[in-house]
From Swiss-Prot:
Family annotation (InterPro entries): PPIase_dom_sf, PPIase_PpiC, PPIase_PpiC_CS, PrsA_foldase
Record bears the keyword Cell membrane: no
Gene source species: Bordetella pertussis (strain Tohama I / ATCC BAA-589 / NCTC 13251)
GO-annotated molecular function: peptidyl-prolyl cis-trans isomerase activity
Protein name, UniProt field: Probable parvulin-type peptidyl-prolyl cis-trans isomerase
Disulfide linkage: none
Top EC group: isomerase
EC number, as in UniProt: 5.2.1.8
Catalytic activity of the protein: [protein]-peptidylproline (omega=180) = [protein]-peptidylproline (omega=0)
Family assignment from sequence similarity: Belongs to the PpiC/parvulin rotamase family.
Signal peptide residue numbers: 1-19
Keyword annotations from UniProtKB, A to Z: Isomerase, Rotamase, Signal
Top-level division of the source organism's lineage: Bacteria
Segments forming domain PpiC: 127-219
Length: 258
């Protein structure tokens, strides 16, 4: 086994430089290194490294080289708009690389995640969420007619919503919007919801940009804040974005901008 390993190493050392190219296109080499980098990029996005993948990428690199050479031969690469796109692409690559490098050097810590979690949890303390149902119609008269029918018999709400509501997302469920904090809704819908207690119906229809609403709150409960592990990925991403925003602000303050 040791002898085989030594022979393999010797073969690698003895390989001439041209053998490190996986292909050439009109004399232009496609190197093993560039293929490996391309494969690494694709694998980082979820693909599995395999001979089939490497062959596909190799053919893609050949195709690209064929097109690039044709573009250069025809003078396309020298066109002003193409040069602008190339420069914008170069800038984008550099910006992404800079951000990735900065985040690697300034990673989000567990302490930061915990502090952010506790901060948001404190802000949400005492907040309520509501189980709401509504009937959406186009005009006030229809809304008033429906409201009167519901007031006479709340059991009618389900059927009236199914037959009359213009909200396709909730009509088939009898107007049920499920559980949500009032902030999920537009004003003045949200304001109307917060004024209602469990089982209450609005006194009059509420108008929004969507039309006229007959609103009923079926139930209320305190917002249940998720465990930290459940929201850790979102918190980490939010903190990374904050880190980058602060870095950008720092760079702009240091730059001479006229």
């Amino acid at each position: 086994m040791k002898r085989i390993a030594m022979l393999a190493a010797a073969c690698v050392i003895a390989v001439p430089a041209f053998a490190q190219n996986v292909a050439t296109v009109n004399g232009k080499p496609i190197t093993q290194k560039s293929l490996d980098e391309f494969v690494k990029l694709v694998v980082s996005q979820g693909a599995t490294d395999s001979p089939q993948l490497r062959e596909q990428i190799k053919q893609e690199m050949i195709n690209r080289q064929v097109f690039v050479q044709a573009a250069e031969k025809d003078g396309v690469a020298k066109q002003a708009d193409v040069q602008t796109e190339i420069e914008l692409a170069r800038q984008g690559i550099l910006v992404r690389a800079l951000m990735a490098d900065y985040l690697q050097k300034h990673p989000v810590t567990d302490a930061q995640v915990k502090a952010e979690y506790e901060k948001i949890k404190k802000e949400q303390a005492g907040k309520m969420e509501y189980k709401v149902r509504h009937i959406l119609v186009e005009d006030e008269k229809t809304a008033n007619d429906l409201l009167a029918q519901v007031k006479s018999n709340k059991n009618k709400f389900d059927d009236l919503a199914k037959k009359n509501s213009k909200d396709p997302g909730s009509a088939e469920r009898g107007g049920d919007l499920g559980w949500a904090p009032a902030t999920n809704y537009v004003q003045p819908f949200a304001e109307a919801v917060t004024k209602l207690k469990k089982g209450q119906l609005v006194d009059k229809p509420v108008q929004t940009q969507f039309g006229w609403h007959v609103i009923q709150v079926d139930d209320t409960r305190p917002v249940e804040f998720p465990a930290m592990d459940q929201v850790r990925p979102q918190l980490e991403e939010m903190l990374r974005q904050q880190t980058l925003a602060n870095y950008q602000k720092q760079l702009r303050e240091q730059a001479k901008i006229q």
